Amino acid sequence: MHFIYLILDAANNVQMTCTEMRAKMNIGLIAHDAKKILMQNFAIAYRGILSKHDIYATGTTGRLIEEVTNLNIHKYLAGHLGGEQQLASQIEHNQIDMVIFLRDPLSPKSHEPDVNNVIHLCDTYNIPFATNLATAELLIKALDRGDLEWREILKREGL
């Protein structure tokens, strides 16, 4: 978002300044057990960016991120207890702007339908979604540049 301010100088000449203010986004973070340390390291590396936004995470992942970053995390239940379903509900209501879900593709999960539902909903509602570190880094840097501000327009328009 850009804000333009008109300011009068001492000679009553109009001076125009433009400041940029990034929209605060709601970011969902989930990590399978084998990826939790990777998620912690990701959160440490990008703490400065994450601190400018509201972070939502499944229970254990959120607690682990809080421990290493001191960020305030809105925590759902643990993933296998319904946390992924809680995130899915927020996605359906257009309350999440981006999801980083560090998945372990080698270990099948008993709650795999919940995982697939999150993926399906992100695709349905055009929520930027990463399942690996490379894509997560691209998204977090795009977030920092303001490349995801189009999400705010969608929310305002009720889309």
Predicted regions mapped to residue ranges:
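Short, glycine-/small-residue-rich phosphate/pyrophosphate-handling segment
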Residues: 134-159
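Short internal beta-strands
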Residues: 53-61
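Mid-chain, well-packed structural core segment of small domains
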Residues: 84-120
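Short, acidic/small-residue loops that bind anionic groups at enzyme active sites
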Residues: 119-139
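Short hydrophobic/aromatic-enriched beta-strand-loop microsegments
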Residues: 54-55, 71-82, 150-153
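N-terminal amphipathic/basic-hydrophobic helices that include classical n-h-c signal peptides
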Residues: 1-17
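Glycine-rich beta-alpha loop segments
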Residues: 21-54
